[in-house]
Amino acid sequence: MGKPLYLVKFIIIGSQSVGKSCLLFRFIDNKFKSQSTHTIGVDFSSRVVDIQGKNVKLQIWDTAGQERFRSVVISYYRGSAGVALVYDVTNRESYNHITNWLSDVKSLASPDVTIILVGNKADLTEQREVTFLEASRIAQENGLLFMETSALTGEGVEEMFLKCTRTIMTKIDSGEVNLEHLGVQISSDSGNVTKKPGDSSNCSC
């Protein structure tokens, strides 16, 4: 039997045009999506990563930032183990909306969810409107992980997803979180369902 495969749901949220789809495309294909269009509702991609010797399949949901899709997006908070809350470092308004997005996460997602605040477009230094220091401060005040990224150059993108996933897996290993509440599932790499740690019942994958 191969190593267990952890199935972890991850969502990307944030205002329109902050680069959510470009971050996902960079992480999945290691390319910059120069002709990116606005996400209609929700888009989906997945990738298997190695975290501390464990195979983890990230099921990543890229959500629309427009208000008219809000009712569609909110259902995807449930069962998410990780949330990337993205703002544009060159757009103060997108940063100011962070508190609204955080309010949605706290009211709709599991209390065990891991949130990483992501300042995208960090390569545009001359157009920057939000400093690293002020964003790191708000992350610390709200108990969030924090990184700056550039989907264009790839800087920080891989590490952003891996950092959040490592935190999730550390919580799982330590027994801090309820796997069922987070929607985390475990199967063998052959597709056979295995038991959750400390659980006598099987999970359905």
UniProtKB/Swiss-Prot annotation:
SUPFAM superfamilies: P-loop containing nucleoside triphosphate hydrolases. The modification Cysteine methyl ester is found at C205. GTP binds at residues 14-22, 62-66, 120-123, 150-152. A motif (Effector region) lies at residues 36-44. Keywords: Cell membrane, GTP-binding, Lipoprotein, Membrane, Methylation, Nucleotide-binding, Prenylation, Protein transport, Transport. It is a lipid-anchor. CDD domains: Rab4. It comes from the Eukaryota. Pfam families: Ras. GO terms for cellular component: pathogen-containing vacuole; plasma membrane; recycling endosome. Belongs to the small GTPase superfamily. Rab family. This is Ras-related protein Rab-4.
